[in-house]
Amino acid sequence: MDLHSLLELGTKPTAPHVRNKKVILFDTNHQVSICNQIIDAINSGIDLGDLLEGGLLTLCVEHYYNSDKDKFNTSPIAKYLRDAGYEFDVIKNADATRFLDVIPNEPHYSPLILALKTLESTESQRGRIGLFLSFCSLFLPKLVVGDRASIEKALRQVTVHQEQGIVTYPNHWLTTGHMKVIFGILRSSFILKFVLIHQGVNLVTGHDAYDSIISNSVGQTRFSGLLIVKTVLEFILQKTDSGVTLHPLVRTSKVKNEVASFKQALSNLARHGEYAPFARVLNLSGINNLEHGLYPQLSAIALGVATAHGSTLAGVNVGEQYQQLREAAHDAEVKLQRRHEHQEIQAIAEDDEERKILEQFHLQKTEITHSQTLAVLSQKREKLARLAAEIENNIVEDQGFKQSQNRVSQSFLNDPTPVEVTVQARPINRPTALPPPVDSKIEHESTEDSSSSSSFVDLNDPFALLNEDEDTLDDSVMIPSTTSREFQGIPEPPRQSQDIDNSQGKQEDESTNLIKKPFLRYQELPPVQEDDESEYTTDSQESIDQPGSDNEQGVDLPPPPLYAQEKRQDPIQHPAVSSQDPFGSIGDVNGDILEPIRSPSSPSAPQEDTRAREAYELSPDFTNYEDNQQNWPQRVVTKKGRTFLYPNDLLQTNPPESLITALVEEYQNPVSAKELQADWPDMSFDERRHVAMNL
């Protein structure tokens, strides 16, 4: 015995076995009415159970053989199904006019009988059977991909057929619920798939509009789920006049071994004959030996070569470790193409001028094909990224925040940092609502959540170059985007002119809504800033100091809730001692160079409203977050007259634009914004809060 044959043991059946299955066929003198009632039962979502396969086969026999049982029994369809283990049991009831009358009177059919008694059927047209079968065939091309892709493909085909005037389907058939039912039936019914495929391939005469739709759908189903077979046979095992030659890129020894194994798997697949291109849809034997993962290098090279030839079907992702191999194969194939074209042009061109024209044309043709391929692939990836973002958002909203919500209170009560400056506000009886946490632990978890929302898009893929990052990020609210989205300033809340009870109810509703949607990333409540200020980010990147977060992007925490403005008292300012220079090595800033420019466009210069300009300073009670009656965010005036929005301005990892303007224009040795950016310190939340009161 050859010892190496051990590797192949168990891959081929030595005692083939076929499981026997019984299929019930219905035979009456009113076959069209029975078939229409079967269609109505399926459309109504009634589960026919083990009668489903028989009911579908009854429809096929009526449509293709006009219910002639003798013709059907001698047909290739019946022979194949018998070889596959199906046994036909015919129930005859000549006088039956209802589907109810032909159902066996057995206990396990009683729920089905009760459901059918409530079903009213008024249709008795024979053409409706072909209409239903053609509608089912629309789901075949993308059946192995999934329900969403299959339904989208079916709807596109319906639109095409309606525009061409071929056939029009009832509107209630085109609802998502009904189409999911049909998809589930087609996914589970081998008989229906097999009969549609067999007749779509072999029906050569007697076509009506429904049969042409079925043939068209079956043609699109060829090699569905067998992309590796199609690409390898077309581009790797190249057929020439002298025989089959290997592509130059797969002539190395290791890839040759994969090619040999792949040829063996193909020979096993070819035993299925005319049904081999539909092996994945029909789930035929040997299909599991044709997975991409079994031939990683061959698959990567084949996909790279196919993409170089303009195949958009090859836009699938290979394993991450073989992504670079795919890119290398793509580049090499493009160069080989140019070389072959150059050689051909040299052979067929009669003079230099013709050679130049042909070379220019082929160069343009290659570039156009390549750009079109990249455009289609980028569209596919954008669609995939949007789908991934939607799924990620749903998961995070349903699960992620529930886990971190329990830690909100505790994380805030643990901050013992002393604050020297005080704020006095009139106490109002209102429900206590703690500000949102600035907790590095929670922020790090949410960072990981957001980074996985784009996991479907391979960052190393050269074909994602045309992806519009801004578009992808806009569709996913979980991914921070400061370049493509301009924040609009929040309108100033209405002054308190109603009873305390009314304002209390509004504040409860507002804070509740904010807690419900914590991950909407400033969509509903952006920070207060002007349009011309949108280039600096509001991300809080405290996770930079944490291990393992070097490659992750900082995630915004939800902003503090905005309450209705209160009646304010005159501020009482206390001198504060500066303990830290927030501007690093910029120099001495003792002079009051931070005088705000009083213009409507400056974020630090609010409109001429005395209430809006009244300064607030934090009280010692705020250390333990007991004074929760403050407005969030607050305008804070420092001892140098600088107005900041606390905590928003000081939580930024980049200096605010108003501060940049003041330093660049008024400092005696002007510094550039780039230098200021470099000197802007990396501080924790506690340090920023401390600096905010001591500028």
From Swiss-Prot:
Check the record and name the InterPro entries matching this protein.
Ebola_NP
Disordered: region residues: 423-458, 483-612
Listed GO MF terms: RNA binding
> What family, per the record?
Belongs to the filoviruses nucleoprotein family.
Complexes and interactors: Homooligomer. Homomultimerizes to form the nucleocapsid. Binds to viral genomic RNA. Interacts with VP35 and VP30 to form the nucleocapsid. Also interacts with VP24 and VP40.
In terms of domain of life, where is this protein from?
A: Viruses
- Give the gene symbol: NP
Biological function: Encapsidates the genome, protecting it from nucleases. The encapsidated genomic RNA is termed the nucleocapsid and serves as template for transcription and replication. During replication, encapsidation by NP is coupled to RNA synthesis and all replicative products are resistant to nucleases.
Q: Keyword Glycoprotein: yes or no?
A: no
Domain comment as written in the entry: This protein can be divided into a hydrophobic N-terminal half, and a hydrophilic and highly acidic C-terminal half. The coiled coil region is critical for homooligomerization, for the interaction with VP35 and for NP function in RNA synthesis.
> How is the protein altered post-translationally, as described in the entry?
Phosphorylated.
Localisation per UniProt entry: Virion; Host cytoplasm
GO CC, alphabetical: helical viral capsid; host cell cytoplasm; ribonucleoprotein complex; viral nucleocapsid
Question: Where is there biased composition of kind Polar residues?
Answer: 495-505, 537-552
Cite the entry's keywords alphabetically.
Capsid protein, Coiled coil, Helical capsid protein, Host cytoplasm, Host-virus interaction, Phosphoprotein, Ribonucleoprotein, RNA-binding, Viral budding, Viral budding via the host ESCRT complexes, Viral nucleoprotein, Viral release from host cell, Virion
Renumbered ranges of motif PTAP/PSAP motif: 603-606
Q: What is this protein called?
A: Nucleoprotein
State any GO BP term from the record. viral RNA genome packaging
Which regions form coiled coils? 316-341, 372-399
